[in-house]
């Protein structure tokens, strides 16, 4: 069977020219040359989203125009007048199939044109690659796949009457009535047509990709024309060993490999470094309900260089004689006492303080005498402080005592209803600077109290007098130690003077106490070394305090930070 011979290319493929005689008898020759042929395109379809994913014909077609002038009898001597010729040129592109197809009897009309984009281009006079007029089509797309050609039709608009055709009628360009608009008298005349070589329109699956921009496109773009320049290769390679239509996007591989970065082993400077755990001995007990806050405060104490709170152990009775006034090292702790029948003895109003995590102090086997000056009762286990008073921002404990008349009968209710912590801080020794941390040894404060040394000057020194020694108060309740050890699991007793009343109503209640009733008049934290009796803070009395003031105006008894009880005139009554 004989094969069909290939179709002969049309005579106007790539190049075409035409000549005409002007009214002055000169011969003008128009020559079109398709300098950059279209090679490939991707079908964009005809749907609603076709314009969003449209690929232009690659490379963009570029057609060169040259105009020559010569004598009608001498075609050898031609003069290039492309830049000097005064006229407007337009090139209109259409699409046709490369292989003509016979039409059917009832061929339906196409619903939409196959060629889309901008099919019209004006002339651009450029100096490179040569001085000529150029028509550029950077935005041409084809909707359906197949093999096509582009037809370029040249139209001219003459501006001077001498350049019109020799047989054309003379038209008056003057307007007799300038005030009235006149119909346009300019006309576009068709000059010639040129076709491109066949190119293939691929489907989206088979499209090989866009190639690198050609040198002609770069030269044209450098002179200000709108041409898309692609400096990277976007051709997809097909595998040689496979026969199916597998497309390999090399550019995608390059882009993904460029995103891979070596991990920084030195760490990013902007990433916050996690703070190490605190080495303080005030670790959080698992049963403590405020463990998160306790960890935060213990870490803050380590961060500022403070020593964490040590578990308080009851020291041995001190020997007679003066003790060192400034002792910054805590006493060596004794073995802790075994837990009582209520190991979860905690205050529900401690508000983040960590004093309730320490075991209760152990009682001595015999009652204390006046010479030993035993530590009085505390609703919370006592512990020594080793922090800077200028940076203290945590809640302190209120400085109120408890009435002796109700102490023996209501001692068993202390483990059930946690009492508020005390707020009073121990007095500073005479030879200790105000900026240094307070000593954590109770013996140091004991010796200072025995010698009745004056306190260091504070902003409220005029309001708080020196405290007398309390040796006479230690023997008021000799039998309370044995009674309280059986009911409150080895808790020290109060050392109160006779006739002293308490500020707190410690009776059992059916509901929780309010914050105001628990913390008394000073319900704010202490900052910059302030004391609870400083006038900088307003005094706000609780209901129990106001009831006490109405009943008596006697001295009040309060507990010192080192465990001793002291009496003085209430500042609110002065």
From Swiss-Prot:
Ranges of compositional bias, category Low complexity: 459-474, 482-493
Designated name of the protein: Developmental and secondary metabolism regulator veA
UniProt region (PEST), positions on chain: 457-501
Compositional bias of kind Basic and acidic residues: 513-525
Primary residence: nucleus
Disruption phenotype annotation: Reduces the production of penicillin.
Function: Component of the velvet transcription factor complex that controls sexual/asexual developmental ratio in response to light, promoting sexual development in the darkness while stimulating asexual sporulation under illumination. The velvet complex hat acts as a global regulator for secondary metabolite gene expression. Controls the expression of the penicillin gene cluster.
PROSITE patterns, A to Z: VELVET
Family affiliation: Belongs to the velvet family. VeA subfamily.
One GO cellular component, as annotated: nucleus
Region (Disordered): 1-22, 39-60, 255-500, 513-540
Pfam families documented for this protein: Velvet (PF11754)
Keywords, ordered alphabetically: Cytoplasm, Nucleus, Sporulation, Transcription, Transcription regulation
Protein's UniProt keywords contain Transcription regulation: yes
One of the GO BP terms on file: sporulation resulting in formation of a cellular spore
Motif (Nuclear localization signal): 39-44
InterPro entries given in the database record: Velvet, Velvet_dom, Velvet_dom_sf
Residue span(s) of domain Velvet: 25-230
Quaternary structure, from the entry: Component of the heterotrimeric velvet complex composed of laeA, veA and velB; VeA acting as a bridging protein between laeA and velB.
Lineage: Eukaryota, Fungi, Dikarya, Ascomycota, Pezizomycotina
Regions of compositional bias (Pro residues) in chain numbering: 314-323, 330-341
């Amino acid at each position: 069977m004989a094969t069909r011979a290939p179709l002969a290319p049309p005579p106007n493929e790539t190049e075409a020219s035409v000549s005409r005689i002007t009214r002055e008898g000169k011969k003008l020759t128009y020559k079109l040359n398709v300098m950059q042929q279209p090679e490939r395109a991707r079908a964009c379809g005809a749907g609603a989203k076709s314009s969003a994913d449209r690929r232009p014909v690659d490379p963009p077609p570029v057609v060169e125009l040259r105009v020559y002038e010569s004598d009608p009898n001498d075609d050898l001597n031609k003069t290039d007048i492309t830049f000097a010729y005064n006229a407007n040129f337009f090139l209109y592109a259409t699409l046709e199939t490369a292989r003509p197809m016979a039409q059917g009897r009832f061929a339906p009309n196409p619903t939409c044109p196959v060629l889309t984009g901008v099919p019209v281009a004006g002339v651009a006079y450029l100096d490179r690659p040569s001085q000529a007029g150029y028509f550029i089509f950077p935005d041409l797309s084809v909707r359906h796949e197949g093999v096509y050609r582009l037809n370029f039709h040249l139209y001219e608009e003459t501006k001077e009457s001498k350049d019109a055709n020799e047989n054309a009628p003379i038209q008056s360009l003057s307007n007799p009535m300038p005030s009235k608009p006149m119909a346009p008298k300019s006309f576009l005349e068709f000059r010639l047509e040129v076709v491109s070589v066949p190119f293939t329109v691929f489907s989206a699956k088979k499209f090989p990709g866009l190639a690198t921009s050609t040198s002609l496109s770069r030269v044209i773009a450098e002179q200000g024309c709108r041409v898309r320049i692609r400096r990277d290769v976007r051709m997809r390679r097909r595998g040689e060993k496979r026969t199916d239509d597998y497309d390999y996007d090399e550019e995608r591989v390059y882009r993904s490999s460029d995103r891979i970065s070596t991990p920084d082993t030195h760490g990013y400077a902007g990433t916050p470094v996690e703070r190490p755990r605190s080495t303080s001995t005030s670790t959080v007990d698992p049963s403590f309900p405020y463990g998160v806050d306790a960890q935060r405060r213990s870490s803050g104490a380590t961060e500022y260089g403070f020593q964490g709170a040590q578990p308080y152990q009851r020291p041995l009775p001190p020997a007679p004689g003066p003790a060192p006034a400034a002792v910054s090292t805590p006493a060596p702790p004794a073995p802790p006492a075994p837990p009582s029948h209520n190991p979860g003895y905690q205050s529900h109003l401690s508000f983040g303080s960590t004093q309730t995590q320490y075991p209760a102090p152990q009682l001595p086997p015999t009652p204390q005498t006046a010479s030993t000056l035993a530590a009085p009762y505390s609703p919370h286990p006592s512990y020594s402080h080793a922090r800077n008073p200028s940076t203290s921002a945590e809640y302190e404990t209120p400085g109120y005592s408890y009435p002796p008349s109700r102490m023996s009968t209501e001692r068993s209710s202390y483990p059930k209803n946690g009492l508020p912590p005390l707020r009073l801080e121990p007095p500073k020794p005479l030879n200790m600077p105000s900026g240094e941390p307070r000593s954590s040894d109770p013996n140091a404060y004991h010796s200072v109290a025995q010698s009745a040394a004056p306190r260091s000057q504070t902003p409220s020194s005029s309001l708080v007098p020196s405290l007398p020694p309390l040796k006479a108060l230690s023997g008021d309740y000799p039998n309370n130690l044995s009674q309280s050890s059986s009911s409150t699991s080895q808790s020290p007793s109060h050392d109160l003077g006779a006739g002293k009343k308490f500020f707190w109503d410690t009776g059992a209640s059916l509901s929780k106490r309010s914050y105001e009733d628990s913390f008394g008049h000073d319900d704010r934290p202490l900052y910059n070394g302030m004391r609870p009796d400083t006038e900088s803070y307003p005094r706000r009395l609780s209901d129990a305090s106001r009831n006490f003031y109405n009943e008596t105006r006697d001295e009040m008894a309060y507990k010192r930070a080192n465990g001793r009880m002291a009496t003085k005139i209430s500042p609110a009554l002065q």
